[in-house]
Design a protein with these regions (language model features):
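C-terminal outer-membrane beta-barrel translocator/porin domains of Gram-negative envelope proteins
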Residues: 1-102, 106, 119-121, 157, ...
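Residue-level signature of outer-membrane beta-barrel architecture
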Residues: 18-20, 94-96, 137-139, 150, ...
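Short Gly/Pro-enriched loop/turn and capping motifs at secondary-structure junctions
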Residues: 99, 116-120, 142, 152-153
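Flexible, small/polar- and glycine-enriched "cap/hinge" segments at structural transition points
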Residues: 106-109, 114-116, 139, 170
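Outer-membrane beta-barrel transmembrane domain signature
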Residues: 116-130
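Outer-membrane beta-barrel "beta-signal"
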Residues: 135-139, 160-171
Length: 171
């Protein structure tokens, strides 16, 4: 392999988020991300710098990091994700207070539509999509999110994971 000191590559990443509040505490949220990376000259791209997409924080309804290029592992009989040098992710989420919760804004329901994928050297822009529902709670320990995602465009090799849990921020 190539010693780490000889690896030369670049990464470009951008993210855009927009939130719009409506009456009665309803919020429409958008998240968009793109990333691209490439090695210089004849140097190989370090696979440890690959992007991964799938799961909460990217495309819910799929297992974390499972989308994009894969290889078939003959030892386990499963497809393993390899990540990719480019990624695209888009999330649209509509959040409402839980009916009957009154002034308590810590518990909220949301619906979402997600799309995205990662790519190797060939970018073909085939996206995976999902939609679903979830519950978020601003707990004393921080934000918690539970979501149930349903893939729209999945392949037999995709690792589907419908129920997911997240600790942390909105996207």
């Amino acid at each position: 392999g190539t010693p780490a000191g000889n690896m030369t590559f670049y990464r470009v990443y951008g993210q855009y988020q927009k939130y719009h509040s409506f009456s009665k505490g309803n919020i429409l949220s958008f998240n968009g991300e793109v990333g691209y990376s490439q090695a210089y000259g004849n140097n190989p791209f370090p696979i440890t710098k690959n992007y991964y997409v799938g799961g909460i924080g990217s495309v819910r309804g799929y297992a974390p990091g499972s989308l994009g290029p894969t290889f078939y592992n003959t030892n386990t009989g499963t497809y393993q994700p390899t990540g990719g040098q480019s990624k695209i992710v888009s999330n649209l989420e509509y959040t409402v207070p839980v009916p009957g919760s009154g002034a308590d804004k810590t518990l909220r329901l949301f619906g979402f539509v997600d799309g995205g994928n990662v790519y190797g050297q060939n970018i073909n822009l085939v996206l995976r999509y999902s939609y679903g529902l979830g519950l978020s709670w601003i707990s004393p320990l921080g934000p918690l999110k539970f979501s149930y995602g349903i893939p729209i465009r999945s392949l037999p090799t995709d690792n589907v994971q419908r129920l997911q849990f997240q600790v942390g921020t909105a996207f």
